[in-house]
């Protein structure tokens, strides 16, 4: 019975998210399945999973890889894993070579993402803009922005992200509606 309740809660949550999303329901589900599959494959690769930190974000078939690996070869391997899945339209590999990120840095990144998302709620004057359509992910102070947005929306989102204290750099991974 608990499993059914969890499934119903997940479905209700997903339905609420999809209401605001410019992607189709099928695309949202496909993105989630792709993300989970790629993460699983990376975690099953013992060399990639050990002493490396790779995060995967998928939006509209575009895969963003961020984090750190100990070698460029491992970064390339993570990219190859992602490219091996049907439905992947493009892979953006932003994995850096270097030591694994500390837990404290990860917490700071989550706070930074929250600050940027909060700032997006202040965007007014753009007809139809919904800040929930923008995916904000932060790694080592670098903010990655994904979503299906207009050029005007993208410019405002980037402007707000850059103005957020603590942001080192902003990387656009948008797809444009116009």
Locate each region found by the language model.
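N-terminal targeting leaders
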Residues: 2, 8, 13-178
């Amino acid at each position: 019975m608990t499993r059914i309740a969890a499934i119903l809660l997940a479905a209700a949550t997903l339905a609420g998210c999809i209401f605001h999303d410019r992607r189709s329901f099928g695309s949202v589900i496909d993105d989630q399945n792709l993300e989970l599959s790629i993460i699983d494959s990376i975690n099953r690769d013992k060399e990639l999973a050990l002493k490396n930190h790779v995060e995967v974000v998928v939006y509209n078939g575009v895969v963003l890889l961020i984090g750190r690996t100990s070698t460029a070869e491992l970064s390339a391997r993570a990219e190859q894993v992602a490219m091996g899945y049907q439905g992947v339209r493009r892979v953006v590999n932003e994995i850096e070579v270097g030591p694994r990120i500390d837990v404290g840095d990860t917490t700071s990144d989550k706070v930074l993402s929250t600050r940027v998302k909060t700032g997006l709620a202040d965007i007014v004057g753009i007809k139809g803009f919904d800040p929930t359509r923008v995916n904000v992910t932060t790694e080592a102070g670098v903010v990655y922005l994904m979503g299906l947005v207009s050029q005007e929306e993208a410019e405002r989102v980037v402007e707000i992200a850059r103005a957020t204290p603590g942001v080192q750099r902003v990387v656009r991974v948008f797809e444009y509606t116009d």
